[in-house]
Amino acid sequence: MIQTEFEFTLPKGYLDGEGNLHRKGVMRLSRAMDEIVPMRDPRVKSNPAYATVIILSRVITHLGALDDVSPAVIENLFACDLSYLQKFYRNINGLEEEDEV
């Protein structure tokens, strides 16, 4: 059976409005629609980099005590955590470039 969900721990963590820190989460493998749907979003049309925010909010199934990881949550991550999640996403989905021999 193929593994479709992967646990992660953010370097710093998401600090919510109540001061709670959320570091551990789960990301599922991406499907084609996870990368297609954001392209229809007006925020992505005006700023293509925003696709990353939407894609991550679609594939992170939970983060700490949060069951709903919205684009607003991703927008409020520390930069190092966003970078970590982008690398984690590429790694679990087999999108990392391999070194040439």
Question: Predicted segments — roles?
Answer:
Residues 1-101:
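Short, surface-exposed, charged amphipathic helix/loop patches that serve as local interaction elements
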